[in-house]
Amino acid sequence: MLDVAIIGCGVVGAAAAYELSHYPLHTAIFEAENDVADCTTKANSAILHAGYDPEPGTRMARLNVEGVALAKEICARLDVPYRQCGSLVLALSPAELPHLQKLYENGLANGVPGIRLLSAEETRAMEPGLSPEVAGALYAPSAAIVSPWEYALAMAEVAVRNGVELHLSSPVTGIQETASGWALTTPSGVVEARYVVNAAGIRADAVHDMAAPHQFTIQPTRGEYYLLDKSEGMRVQHVIFQCPNENGKGVLVAPTVHGNLIVGPNAEPVAGDDTACTAAGLAFVSAAARRSVPDIRFGESIRNFAGVRANVDTGDFVIGEAEGAPGFIDLAGMKSPGLSSAPAVAKEVVRILEGRGDLPAAKTDYRDGRTRVRFKELPPEEKAKLIARDPAYGRVICRCETITEGEILDALHTEIPATTIDGVKRRCNAGMGRCQGGFCGPRVLELISRTRGIDPLDVLQDKAGSNVLLCETKQEGTNHD
C-alpha cells in the first residue's frame, strides 16, 4: 500500500512530490499524459507573480507571496532558468490610477516586498518603449520569469531520485474509499493508498467527484500567446501588465528566460483541453499588447500556442481534505498565481499529514540538488574540456539554440527521460528556436529511436498518437495514397 498517491504531475503535483520526497513515505505519482508538465504547466505566461493581485486574506494571497520566495530558492538549488526582473502594472489613462492604488494596498496587506507606485515619467524611464498613454505604474521588484516546464521537471526528477514512483500514461479512472484509505483504478490495476493528493489541474473537479460530494466546478479557460524571436527579446526588461479585470491579469508583454518575448493571453472558456489558436483570439492579443508596447514587431513571431487554465467557481484555491473524504486532499483551482504558489501549496500537504500525526521525521540521507549542461553558456575552456571527455558535446544538432548531441543524450538519460521530440525540447531546448525544429527535428527523432531502441515510425512529437513518420518511403510495396 502507498502512503500517498498524487494524481497529476504538473507543477503543483511535482512540487507536492518534491516536498513529500523529503520524508520516508511510499509516494507515487499517477500522470495521465506520457510526460510530466504536459498540460497547463507547459503553456502559460511563465511568470512568478509578486502577489499584489489576490485579495488579502485569501489562500491565493498568502501562498503566492510564500511561493514566489520559495521558487527562487528551489530554482537556484535545482539549476532551473530563473530571472528576477520585476513587473510593472500600467495605468493607461488617469482613470486607471485608482486601480493601481488598490493593487498597491493589496500588495502591502499581502506582504509583497518593495512595491511602489511610479509616475508616468518614472515608468517610461524604466521602460522607454511603453505607450505614451501611460499615466503611471505599480512596480513590484520581486516578480520573476522562469522556465515552467523545467521547474516542474526538476522537482519531479529530484523526487524520483529520492524514491517517489512515477507512472506516466496512467489516468486514474475510479476512486473508492476503503477501510484503510483509498483504492485508485489505473491502467495497470487497482492501487491502494492511505492518502490521495488531487493535483489533476483542469480535471481536478472530476477527480474530486469520484471521491467526495461535489464541492467546486472548474471552467477550463484558454489563453492564446505569441512567442517572438530573440530579435524582439530586449523589447522590454520587465514583465508588463495592464490593469487586471474580471478575466484575469490581462494581456502581458514579457521577456523569457531563454531570450524571447512572450505576449498574451486572452481568456476564452472552452470545453476540456482545447488548445487551438484562433485568428480572433490572436488578433485580440496583438491589439491589446500594442496598447502597452506599440512597437512590437509581431512579424517576428516564431510560434503561436495556447494553454488552458483551471478557473474555479470558488474564486480561491481549493486546498485541504475534502468534506466527507478523510485523507483525500484537494489541490485544485490552480489558475494564476498557481505557478507562483506551487511550492507553498505543496507545504500545505505536509502540514495536513503532520496535523493528522502521519508525518515521519525527515530523511537524513536526502539527495537534493541538480545540475544541467548548457553548452552554449560555458566559457571556451570548459567547452573544450567537455568535448574532450565526450565528443557528443562537440556536435551541434540544434543550430538555432546551439544545443549539442551530448545535451540531447542527457535529456534521454535523466531520472525522467524524454521519450518524445517535445520531451527533448522541454528538457534541453532543442527545437525551441527560430526554425521550431525544422532543421534539428529529424536528427532528434533519430537519436530518440537509437537511444530507446524503437522504430523511427514509433517516435512521437508529443502526446499519444502524434507519430511524426507514417511510413518508409522506399519500402517495397508501400502505398502512399
Enumerate the language-model features and the residues they cover:
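N-terminal Rossmann-like FAD-binding beta1-loop-alpha1 element of flavoenzymes
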Residues: 2-28
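Dinucleotide-binding Rossmann-like beta1-alpha1 core, especially the glycine-rich loop
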Residues: 46-126, 250-251
